[in-house]
Design a protein with these regions (language model features):
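Non-catalytic pre-domain segments flanking phosphatase-related domains
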Residues: 1-14, 64-69, 177, 231-232, ...
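Membrane-embedded alpha-helical bundles of multi-pass transporters/translocases
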Residues: 35, 85-86
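Structural recognition of alpha->loop->beta junctions
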Residues: 137-145, 210-229
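Conserved phosphate-coupling serine/threonine residues in phosphotransfer and NTP-handling enzymes
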Residues: 122-124
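Substrate-recognition "cap/lid" segment bordering the active-site pocket of phosphatases
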Residues: 98, 126-179, 185-194
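Acidic, Mg2+-coordinating phosphoryl-transfer loop and its flanking beta/alpha structural elements
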Residues: 180-218
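Active-site neighborhood of HAD-like aspartate-dependent phosphohydrolases
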Residues: 2-51, 57-60, 64-65, 208
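Short, acidic loop-to-helix structural element flanking the phosphoryl-transfer center
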Residues: 2, 13, 89-120, 130
Length: 242
């Protein structure tokens, strides 16, 4: 059977942390505890050591800062990730500081109404993403996803997405028919390096200029006003020279 595209030929990939939700302090505390459990050392995380990175690279960076020999990091990384996910599953349901950003549900409903193929693109492991999505009942909006457990390098995730979509739905998308929605410089870079389009929501004022420097296709301050995103996506649906 020949591969097909979705009804209107757009594939939307949306990031989780910082884009749709603010997960609060619990994930960071869970990871810190997991690292301490396996190394006996405490580590702190700044924004640049977390934003846009996959879980395996976040852990590897922490182990490097703790001067753990490179030969030990791979095995230790797997152990820490397993412990982290166990702690996260126990602690996160009780978190009181997690936030679903305004307009996210409306945005996802709009994608559904437009019959866009929508997937999750996240540096979390698949299990970790599920834990974070569940309290907000967001799983229903995603027919598939690609995660840090698929590949440690974020830039490799889009190609995995295209393969997954073909295998699961028998659909093919040209890179310029794929839109990545995120909140960090790395999201924009990931889209550009794969020939895809990018929409960025600014969640931190101190990151605005760095994001602007990467020239995303569109920047929004929040998802409460969906018109800029709707207009941009509708323009993509207009055939050339129409």
């Amino acid at each position: 059977m020949p591969a097909k595209s979705s009804a209107n030929g757009l594939l939307i990939l949306i990031d989780l942390d910082g884009t749709m939700v603010s997960c609060g302090l619990i994930p960071r505390q869970a990871l810190t505890n997991a690292i301490f459990h396996h190394t006996g050392k405490m580590v702190e995380f700044g924004y640049s050591q977390l934003a846009g990175l996959t879980d395996p690279l976040i852990i590897d960076g922490a182990l490097e800062r703790l001067a753990v020999p490179e030969s030990q990091r791979n095995e230790l990384n797997h152990k820490i990730l397993k412990t982290y996910l166990s702690i996260l599953a126990e602690w996160y349901p009780q978190a009181t500081d997690r936030i679903l950003y305004p307009g996210v549900v409306e945005l996802l409903e709009y994608f559904h109404e437009c019959n866009f193929r929508v997937g999750l693109i996240s540096g979390n492991s698949k299990k970790g993403a599920g834990i974070k999505l569940k309290p907000f009942n967001l799983e229903q909006y995603f027919s598939f996803g690609v995660f840090g457990s698929d590949h440690a390098e974020r830039d490799n995730l889009p190609l995995i997405v295209l393969r997954k979509v073909y295998q699961k739905f028998n659909e093919k998308y040209a890179p310029d028919r794929v839109v990545i929605i995120g909140d960090t410089v790395r999201d924009v870079q990931c889209a550009r390096r794969n020939g895809m389009r990018s929409i960025v929501v600014i969640r931190r004022a101190d990151q605005r200029q760095a994001i602007l420097n990467e020239n995303p296709d569109i920047i929004v301050n929040n998802f409460e006003d969906l018109q800029p995103i709707q207009h941009y996506l509708q323009q993509l649906l207009i055939p050339p020279f129409a």
